[in-house]
Amino acid sequence: MGYLFQETLSSNPKTPIVVDDDNELGLMAVRLANAAAFPMVLKAALELGVFDTLYAAASRTDSFLSPYEIASKLPTTPRNPEAPVLLDRMLRLLASYSMVKCGKALSGKGERVYRAEPICRFFLKDNIQDIGSLASQVIVNFDSVFLNTWAQLKDVVLEGGDAFGRAHGGMKLFDYMGTDERFSKLFNQTGFTIAVVKKALEVYEGFKGVKVLVDVGGGVGNTLGVVTSKYPNIKGINFDLTCALAQAPSYPGVEHVAGDMFVDVPTGDAMILKRILHDWTDEDCVKILKNCWKSLPENGKVVVIELVTPDEAENGDINANIAFDMDMLMFTQCSGGKERSRAEFEALAAASGFTHCKFVCQAYHCWIIEFCK
């Protein structure tokens, strides 16, 4: 049904509020102390399909839905009669973070109603083939596998060692995934790869003239699927471990090849390393890059797609927030992985034998960087 609605307002707008620096700092401190609520509610909303449900209604005139309507349209119908009430409480929080818009129906009981905000499209499960989805990344980040690792952070700072290994019997992340099919499948669905690559291809022309393109550590092959759809003359080789390729669909012009990038890399006139280097130590990165160098012709290149950390931690800078969030994620989950600065990428290129390192363009949070032979 359609709703006439008004914007939600403070329940008691005439109540005096003390405004001073100390009060503002106190409010910020309270928000930080309770920061765990938002990501956990976001995760539950994604698992329930709340955003997909709201987004499906967004193109219609009756784009606002009541919690009762949302509950009735979820992929799994709740058995709990209190589900609409609980959803309303979750959605209020999400609205305060601008994930959804909250209004109040003017008819009937004046209940709250909700509509998807534009940011929701980045979290839709149905958008995976179009732009990718951050939904799985949220779910992975708050899976027990990662949460158990985060719990080791204090002890790693005090005593040293590896956070993931301490939590998971000495195994590293990629070894662990070989033992946990559920988590491996979830992990391989994560990320924002398709959106980043599509955005980059709007301006990046570095694949023109490439005949054979190797995606080193290419996972399920979706990056090459996007590139070869724009450049159908390219032969794509999606190179990764057997366990990763087991979940890879077929793409026109793309061959899946199993192997280990620490041993050798298939020959190609250009290569992609997409969000691979941040998983590894500098020493491991040099090993990977040297293997790429050996398999490239003269004037060949590696197209590195990575986040670049700013030199300073600026207050209120969203790029700095993302960079340092991801850096801590790499520190805890990837046994020596880290995000890197421009200078650190230049040092990796030089140590691996490449003549120069060129920062070409930025797409969302990632940079397209060329390591040229």
Swiss-Prot record:
GO terms for molecular function: methyltransferase activity; O-methyltransferase activity; protein dimerization activity. SUPFAM superfamilies: S-adenosyl-L-methionine-dependent methyltransferases, Winged helix' DNA-binding domain. The active site is at residue 278. The keyword S-adenosyl-L-methionine applies. It is an enzyme of class 2 (transferase). Induction: By the green peach aphid Myzus persicae. Pathway: Secondary metabolite biosynthesis. Its EC number is 2.1.1.-. Pfam families: Dimerisation (PF08100), Methyltransf_2 (PF00891). Keywords: Methyltransferase, S-adenosyl-L-methionine, Transferase. S-adenosyl-L-homocysteine binds at residues 217, 240, 260-261, 274. Interacts with B'GAMMA. Belongs to the class I-like SAM-binding methyltransferase superfamily. Cation-independent O-methyltransferase family. PANTHER family: O-METHYLTRANSFERASE (PTHR11746). Involved in indole glucosinolate biosynthesis. Catalyzes methoxylation reactions of the glucosinolate indole ring. Converts the hydroxy intermediates 4-hydroxy-indol-3-yl-methylglucosinolate (4OH-I3M) and 1-hydroxy-indol-3-yl-methylglucosinolate (1OH-I3M) to 4-methoxy-indol-3-yl-methylglucosinolate (4MO-I3M) and 1-methoxy-indol-3-yl-methylglucosinolate (1MO-I3M), respectively. This is Indole glucosinolate O-methyltransferase 1. It comes from Arabidopsis thaliana.
